[in-house]
Amino acid sequence: MSSHGAPIPMTSSACGPLTGEARVPGDKSISHRSLILGALSVGETRISGLLEGQDVLDTAKAMRAFGATVTDHGGGEWSVHGVGVGGFAEPDGVIDCGNSGTGVRLIMGAMATSPISATFTGDASLNGRPMARVTDPLALFGAQSYGRQGGRLPMTVVGAAEPVPVTYTVPVPSAQVKSAVLLAGLNAPGQTVVIEAEATRDHTERMLAGFGAEISVEDADEGRVITLTGQPELKSQKIDVPRDPSSAAFPVCAALIVPGSDVLVPGIGLNPTRAGLFTTLREMGADLTYENERVEGGEPVADLRARFSPDLTGIEVPPARAASMIDEYPVLSVVASFARGDTVMRGVKELRVKESDRIDAMASGLRANGVAVEDGPDWWVVTGRGHGNVAGGATCASFLDHRIAMSFLVMGMATQKPVTVDDAGPIATSFPIFEPLMAQLGARIQRDNG
């Protein structure tokens, strides 16, 4: 069942060439952080190109609950009048973060070092995800948390009245955990240090520096060492949100597997901590080029051009690349189905605790559509069948996971028989215009109204 109402089954069928321009929404990671850092700064932050998916709208609502003034001016233009570091008010009601693991974890961090309490909940998917990986480091600051068995939502977090700075080594690569600790460190005196053995997306570090925080990043023997000086006065900013590479993945990958396709995806953020999928696709032999490369707001940006690539070859994806493409493995596994040979993906334990167990969700759906998959605790291997040889014909469970739903709809565009997703409703959390955008390119996606 969809997180916001009755299930919305969709079926995707083989189509003619995908052509044209795919203007995907603003980056989800940067959209969340823009609202949260705007709320923690002094003055008015103006945001252009904000992703208006449900996840980000839930974060905007949460920032209002903590006392910030958040205004939607229309057309992706938003403003946030912040309350300053340490200025969060105690919310009157429960904070509902919907489907968003990013939203709830970052907000928990942002409030954990203020002398207030907040209760968090979400949809069925989010309430099943473990939160201890965030609440454990927040406890080091002095915050307390009370949730359901297994550290799950609903959960009340009691912020530290007298927070202390923390040095924390992130055990499993996670930008959400790292960011929660850094946001908590904002209102702790002294220096908070985060050490990550493998680099994860660095939007939080870049944006904290942009808002005026004293933050340094160094490479050491133990990994990346991020040092933040607490209790700064963050200054409001003007933010232009680049378009989301995780959303761009879907029209790009669809173009690679649908014969005759030629799709341009303009203005995509190519932060090196996010661009692992595109590097991997090129190594597989994808006809994927970067055009008009530039820097906007401190982030590298380019227009992506993807063309049908009939001779894709399976590869072993370097485990060190996992953090830079963790959300893209589901759709990569779809492309791998149309390649020749094995695509080996290791070091991806994080996929087991996303919106769904993404390895299990994709493996079962791929097998149902005639593709051989092997998997283990932190790895999986997809044996490609080559262009034109993927059967399709199955109904796949989305497990309330937007990326699983979109991945199987992309698959159906090039399989012999249509592919159905049991509930595509969660797509609205990150890519509300997915269906019309893909249809405009030439995809055949139908809602199954029973």
Swiss-Prot record:
State the compartments where it is located: Cytoplasm
Supply the CDD domains for this chain: EPSP_synthase (cd01556)
Which transformation does this protein catalyse, written as a reaction?
A: 3-phosphoshikimate + phosphoenolpyruvate = 5-O-(1-carboxyvinyl)-3-phosphoshikimate + phosphate
Which Pfam families does the record match to this protein?
EPSP_synthase
Binding of 3-phosphoshikimate, residues:
K28, S29, R33, S174, Q176, D327, K354
Extract the InterPro entries matched here: Enolpyruvate_Tfrase_dom (IPR001986), Enolpyruvate_Tfrase_sf (IPR036968), EPSP_synthase (IPR006264), EPSP_synthase_CS (IPR023193), RNA3'P_cycl/enolpyr_Trfase_a/b (IPR013792)
Disordered, as annotated region: 1-23
Q: Known EC number(s)?
A: 2.5.1.19
Report the protein's function.
Answer: Catalyzes the transfer of the enolpyruvyl moiety of phosphoenolpyruvate (PEP) to the 5-hydroxyl of shikimate-3-phosphate (S3P) to produce enolpyruvyl shikimate-3-phosphate and inorganic phosphate.
Q: What family is it from?
A: Belongs to the EPSP synthase family.
User: Could you tell me what this protein is called?
Assistant: 3-phosphoshikimate 1-carboxyvinyltransferase
Q: Which organism is it from?
A: Roseobacter denitrificans (strain ATCC 33942 / OCh 114)
